[in-house]
Structure formats: structure tokens, C-alpha cells
Amino acid sequence: MNKTDLLNSIIRIDENRLLFNYTMFKTIIHPDIYMDLIQLIFQQNDTILQTNAMYDVVVDFKGLTMTGVERYKGFIIALSDEGQRNGKNFLQKLGKITIVNPPFMVANVGKILLPLMDKSVKEKIILG
């Protein structure tokens, strides 16, 4: 499998949704390819927005642990920085974020933080 195929196994398009597979992410990702994956995410997002006004994100967190959160913090920061840099208003065009198989910690943190969030943001997050 080449690098493009590997990256496409982490994140793919399904209609107007970006589907993120953490199980594949953790087996493939390395700091050397963070920007390749981030570029793919934004390319796929652009593809969706060519035919849809909004997009959704589905994240399958099966197997995520606190160690994993700490290990991939650099990727999350790089993704956030690039999103702010590109100025394409992706957050305004985001419909819903569905979190599938949330680990215990995510579900519990979500229960604490969701009541404190702005209603417009809170309505976009679905813990399932």
C-alpha cells in the first residue's frame, strides 16, 4: 500500500461527511506525515464543500486512551494551526461532529464541558 492509500484509510468521504478512523490513524501516523494527512483532510473537505453548503465529521475513537491523546497532541495542534491559517471558515460550515465509540474519559469530559459551551457549538457535537 502506498502512502496515499494509507492516508485515505484514515480519513475518507461519505457523501457530505468526513469519516475519521482512529484505529487506522494510530497504526499509521507518524510526525513525518502529519502535514500530508492534514492536507488530505482539507482537500477532502474542499471536495465536499464543492457540492454541499455544510459538512459533517464522524470520528470513531475505538481504542483511544489517555496515552494516545498525549501521543498525538502534536497532530491536533498542527491541524488546528493549519485550519486557522488557511482561512476557509471550515468551522462555520461544520454541521455536526459525531463521536463514535468515545472512550470513558471523552464521554465524561463531554458531560462536564457540554453544559458550559456556547449553544451553537454544543448543538454540533453528538457523543454516540
Language-model features: where?
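SEC14/CRAL-TRIO lipid-binding/transfer domains and related phosphoinositide-recognition modules
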Residues: 1-96, 100-128
